[in-house]
Amino acid sequence: MERITGVALRYDEELPAPFVAAKGRGELATKLIALAREHGVPVVSREELAESLFYLEVGELVPESFYRVVAELLAFVWRTQGHGAGDIKSRK
């Protein structure tokens, strides 16, 4: 049985990049995902990205080499929540 890896990302417009807010493997990842869903936080399955970002520390900024894929992921989540591109700066 394959172990689940979960990595929670957060974007703060005052920081230069998104950062790792939480992470876990196995049972901890399952709990992290359940907690996110319970609180209405979008959950997206991107196994390769989660595996790559898992090696960052909680609080660590996403490296520049991942900017594009993470930006695409965050834009997808933002759009699926019914927001337009112009809404990003106005939310707080």
Task: Set out the residue ranges of the language-model regions.
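Divalent-cation
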Residues: M1-K92
